[in-house]
Amino acid sequence: MSRVADIPTATVGRVVTYIRVLEELEAQNVLRASSGELARRAGVTPFQVRKDLTYFGRFGTRGIGYTVAVLRRELLRALGLDQTWNVVIVGMGRLGHAIANYPGASDYQFQNVGLFDVAPDVVGREVRGLTIQHMSQLGPFVASVAGTPRQVDMGLLTVPAEHAQAAAQALVAAGVGGILNFAPVVLQTQDLHLPEAFAAPGRREVTVENVDFLAGMKRLAFYMLGPQAGPAEE
C-alpha cells in the first residue's frame, strides 16, 4: 500500500464509493465482479478503478475479476475502517441531534463518545445514552478518556459559522487531531496545530474535512444549465 500522503484525495473519495458499490453487490449475493462492473456502478472507467486500487494493493485476477467480499474487506482495512474511531460532536442543534441519532455510523466503527453545546436549554439532555455536556468540559473530558478505549479521535462541528473556528481550536487544544466541519465556513487550518504533548513525533498537523452540501447543489445547478451554458450577456 502507498503512503497516505501519496494517495490523491480524489482517489480516496472514489474508493469510498467502491466500498458502497461492493456492499450493494454483497447484498445482491454477487460473489465476483469485474472492474467494468465496478466502474459502471461507480460512474467511472474500468481503467480508473484499476488505477485507484493499485494504491492500496494487488487485488483480483485478470479475466476473473474481484472477489466482492474480499475486496470490500481489504478496502475497509486500507481506509482504517476495521478499527474503532471515537467521535465527539460539538453543537447539538438539529443537525447535531440528527448525526448523533444516525445508526449507520456504527457500521463503520464510528462511535459517539461525547456530545457538547453551550445552550443552557440543551446541556444536560440525553441523546442515545450520552448526556450533552457544556463546551467548557470538552478539554477535561478528552483528557479523562485519553489512553483508554474511549479516547477521542475525531470531532464533528455542527455549530454556527461564527463559532466554528473557536470550536475547532478548542478541539485541537484538547488533542483531537481530526475534524469534520459541517459549519458553513472554511476553517483556517494554518491556525490549527496539535499541542506537542498530543502530536506524533514530527507531526502536528490537524486533518480537516469541510462538508458543504450547498456546494453540491451549486455544482448541480451549473450542470443542469446544459451544453449551451455560457457567460451572461452584459
UniProtKB/Swiss-Prot annotation:
Protein name per Swiss-Prot or TrEMBL: Redox-sensing transcriptional repressor Rex
Family designation: Belongs to the transcriptional regulatory Rex family.
Entry's Gene Ontology molecular function annotations: DNA binding; DNA-binding transcription factor activity
Stretches that traverse the bilayer: none
NCBIfam families named among the record's database cross-references: PRK05472.2-3 (NF003994), PRK05472.2-4 (NF003995), PRK05472.2-5 (NF003996)
Disulfide bridge positions per record: none
DNA-binding region: 17-56
Gene Ontology CC entries for this record: cytoplasm
Species of the source: Deinococcus radiodurans (strain ATCC 13939 / DSM 20539 / JCM 16871 / CCUG 27074 / LMG 4051 / NBRC 15346 / NCIMB 9279 / VKM B-1422 / R1)
Residue numbers binding NAD(+): 91-96
Chief location of this protein within or outside the cell: cytoplasm
Taxonomic placement: Bacteria, Thermotogati, Deinococcota, Deinococci, Deinococcales
Gene: rex
BP GO terms, sorted: negative regulation of DNA-templated transcription; response to redox state
Pfam families: CoA_binding, Put_DNA-bind_N
SUPFAM superfamilies for this protein: NAD(P)-binding Rossmann-fold domains, Winged helix' DNA-binding domain
Keywords from the named record: Cytoplasm, DNA-binding, NAD, Repressor, Transcription, Transcription regulation
Assembly and oligomerization: Homodimer.
Localization terms from the record: Cytoplasm
InterPro entries in the cross-refs: CoA-bd (IPR003781), NAD(P)-bd_dom_sf (IPR036291), Rex_DNA-bd_C_dom (IPR009718), Tscrpt_rep_Rex (IPR022876), WH-like_DNA-bd_sf (IPR036388), WH_DNA-bd_sf (IPR036390)
